[in-house]
Amino acid sequence: MFDSTLNPLWQRYILAVQEEVKPALGCTEPISLALAAAVAAAELEGPVERVEAWVSPNLMKNGLGVTVPGTGMVGLPIAAALGALGGNANAGLEVLKDATAQAIADAKALLAAGKVSVKIQEPCNEILFSRAKVWNGEKWACVTIVGGHTNIVHIETHDGVVFTQQACVAEGEQESPLSVLSRTTLAEILKFVNEVPFAAIRFILDSAKLNCALSQEGLSGKWGLHIGATLEKQCERGLLAKDLSSSIVIRTSAASDARMGGATLPAMSNSGSGNQGITATMPVVVVAEHFGADDERLARALMLSHLSAIYIHNQLPRLSALCAATTAAMGAAAGMAWLVDGRYETISMAISSMIGDVSGMICDGASNSCAMKVSTSASAAWKAVLMALDDTAVTGNEGIVAHDVEQSIANLCALASHSMQQTDRQIIEIMASKAR
């Protein structure tokens, strides 16, 4: 798989990116439930007649208001129904990519007949949890996903247990690539990006290909809040400058518009999120195009952006009250700063300013308005880069920003991991009261 001469740590970096940067069709929380339903349906004897599902509060939060691709409908029930009736159990986050018009119609009919239920799992100590149980008469199959959007931990049917994930790691087995990131630094990541052979990271260019296609679709103006298309229109009217700053925001938000509005195109995700993948990709692509960067230079910038985003997000809960478009945009700031001058000091200053700027943005569930937060984060990232180029940044004397960028990141992640847990509960309570 790798050149045997490649630094073992760099191999783990590459594996971490390959593990966390994947194509995903549709918002990944509903898609996680759709995958559970699809795998359960594949285990069931006979066609699915009824679907029951249970999810964690966080997954419910991120599934209430987002459009499921191809359906024109929002919410977890349609995701569960379509996963069960038209999902590809072997396609991971692209579980709905082969869903036919007939499968969509059948899923809607199942919903209309009252044969689909989705409830919050109680009690639930997991942040990311989805369980789907499908029925054919008295026969049933049940699949549980925990911890990661595609991490199936249990499969069971009316005949007994089919699969249970072993919790322990076998002796001599290598640790997860993400575990390596807990012991690395941004400086080491930058060294990797500067020195790794281009051939070893060429694959990251696929993120530009997928997310640029999504952005172009978003500019059609028919998806979500059509923020990208609206801002582009205001450029034509002379109300917004046609410059690099506006291009970064327009093209990034357009991809999120299409993503959240239900376009049937995959996003290249990051850390289990399409919007994080878009945010880590599109600003870097726009700046690379501005400077006429070749494929190798673009790949290195994208690798820095995506790996930095993963590095920061790895210190957070998988889902939390902190909008992770902000942390993905910190990766984008690193990638853009690298394209402009490549200095570690510029990169670290840009990230510190980002932490001093958008770190309080909450996640109130996946919805069309995520594109607003994506556009804000992308804009803040470029602003932070411009400030860093002028040797200006939020300093360690201000707020949660420390004198060292690593400590600044740790402070932000501690806030999200601990204090913001109550914020998350309040958000879920507010959203649940709206749904009643």
Curated annotation (Swiss-Prot):
Pfam families documented for this protein: SDH_alpha (PF03313)
Consequences of knocking out this gene: No effect on protein secretion by the type III secretion system (T3SS) encoded in the locus of effacement (LEE).
InterPro entries membership: Ser_deHydtase-like_asu (IPR005130), UPF0597 (IPR021144)
GO biological process: L-cysteine catabolic process to pyruvate
Residues of the signal peptide: none
Up-regulation conditions: 40-fold induced under conditions that maximally induce expression of the large pathogenicity island (PAI) also called the locus of effacement (LEE); part of the dlsT-yhaM operon. Slightly induced by D-serine.
GO molecular function ontology, one term from the record: L-cysteine desulfhydrase activity
Stated role: Thought to be a D-serine dehydratase, however it does not complement a dsdA (D-serine dehydratase) mutant in strain CFT073, suggesting it may not have that function.
Family: Belongs to the UPF0597 family.
Protein's name in the database: UPF0597 protein YhaM
Lineage summary: Bacteria, Pseudomonadati, Pseudomonadota, Gammaproteobacteria, Enterobacterales
Gene this protein is translated from: yhaM
